[in-house]
UniProtKB/Swiss-Prot annotation:
This is Centrin-1. GO terms for biological process: cell division; centriole replication; microtubule cytoskeleton organization. Residues 28-63, 64-99, 101-136, 137-172 form the EF-hand domain. Ca(2+) 1 binds at residues 41, 43, 45, 47, 52. Monomer. Interacts with CIMAP3. Interacts with USP49. Binds two moles of calcium per mole of protein. Residues 1-30 are annotated as: Disordered. It comes from Bos taurus.
């Protein structure tokens, strides 16, 4: 009697490269996305018109730019039908909601540095946080960190500069 069992090969057992955790929504968030989709699926066909994508996203609190909309439509409407299914809409919104969460997390971290609420991270703020975290960094190293993130040359790091450097380092 021949067995259908095959011994695993090196190729079949090798680790796939991790791309990072796939963003997921809570059931409540999925329900919100479904309700926004259904608002624009008036005929109950299970699809919405690509022209309605922006309005549906606005209903969920997002303000996508024109270039971003073109890119999203190209990603989800590959056949050029002008229609988007709920699953495609859910995929787009899952990504957008994950990005929003990431931005909020980064801004929370920014506020921990900005304890004097100036809207900027100064050398003094950075030095305090480094000390609190037990990081043994020289003043020169701390200044280099400020200089690396400071795009407008004012010697401090504002929210936009902080967001940019955190995304660039892939820490978020």
């Amino acid at each position: 009697m021949a067995s259908s069992y095959r011994k695993p090969t090196v190729a079949s057992t090798s680790q796939k490269r991790k791309v990072g955790p796939k963003p997921e929504l809570t059931e409540e968030q999925k329900q919100e996305v479904r309700e926004a989709f259904d608002l624009f699926d008036a005929d109950g066909s299970g699809t919405i018109d690509v022209k309605e994508l922006k309005v549906a996203m606005r209903a969920l609190g997002f303000e996508p730019r024109k270039e971003e909309m073109k890119r999203m439509i190209a990603d989800v409407d590959k056949e050029g039908t002008g229609k988007i299914s709920f699953n495609d809409f859910l995929a787009v919104m899952t990504q957008k909601m994950a990005e929003k969460d990431t931005k909020e997390e980064i801004l929370k971290a920014f506020r921990l540095f900005d304890d004097d609420e100036t809207g900027k991270i100064s050398f003094k703020n950075l030095k305090r946080v480094a000390k609190e975290l037990g990081e043994n960094l020289t003043d020169e190293e701390l200044q280099e960190m400020i200089d690396e993130a400071d795009r407008d040359g004012d010697g401090e790091v504002n929210e936009d500069e902080f967001l940019r450097i955190m995304k660039k380092t892939n820490l978020y």
